[in-house]
């Protein structure tokens, strides 16, 4: 269970609030979406939940984030630019879940994401993947880490209609809680 109690997030620079007195509980099997306009702190909230060091340089917060022992699977809004020139296989090798996976687990993750398991071993540079392929690649690696909760930051950006339908199915059938943000 993830619980936020009376969470307020402010920019350090001008103390402008991004979120005020926000309380929220995500229980087993829950699916929740936070929708608002761009620039209103949705990504900051997910980063804060996942790893406060990702945002401590530009925001401060008060309140409680209760996440005892939870393993998060975090999908960032943008594919990390530092990986654009490396092959898919090299990107996969940076995931502990991938390195520890059995061939059966890899095949299962690939099937769940409608990928061929050979995709994980591709020499294709990550920067040449479509938006949908990047989302599926990252989600497949998250699945292999077996997180307790998925945190998805704008997962529907830069994907086609077919991949969007697949993403909706993935979220709705995922047995784990999912918190995602959109605009």
Labelled PLM ranges:
Residues 14, 22-37, 70, 175-176:
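Pre-Walker A (P-loop) beta-loop-beta motif of ABC nucleotide-binding domains
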Residues 10-13, 69-141, 145:
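ABC-family P-loop ATPase nucleotide-binding domains
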Residues 5, 24, 124-128:
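Pre-signature/interface helix of ABC/ABC-like ATPase nucleotide-binding domains
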């Amino acid at each position: 269970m993830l619980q936020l109690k009376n969470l307020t997030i402010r920019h350090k620079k001008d103390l402008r609030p991004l979120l005020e007195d926000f309380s929220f509980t995500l229980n087993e099997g829950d699916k929740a979406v936070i929708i608002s306009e761009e620039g209103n702190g949705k990504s900051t909230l997910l980063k804060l939940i996942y790893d406060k060091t990702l945002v401590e340089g530009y925001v401060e917060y008060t309140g409680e984030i209760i996440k005892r022992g939870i393993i998060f699977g975090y999908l960032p809004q943008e594919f990390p630019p530092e990986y654009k020139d490396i092959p898919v296989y090299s990107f996969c090798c940076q995931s502990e879940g991938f390195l520890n996976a059995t061939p059966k687990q890899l095949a299962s993750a690939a099937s769940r994401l409608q990928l061929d398991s050979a995709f994980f071993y591709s020499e294709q540079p990550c920067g040449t993947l479509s938006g949908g392929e990047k989302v599926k690649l990252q989600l497949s690696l998250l699945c292999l880490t077996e997180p307790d909760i998925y945190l998805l930051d704008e997962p529907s950006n830069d994907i086609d209609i077919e991949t969007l339908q697949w993403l909706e199915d993935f979220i709705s059938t995922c047995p784990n809680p999912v918190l995602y943000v959109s605009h």
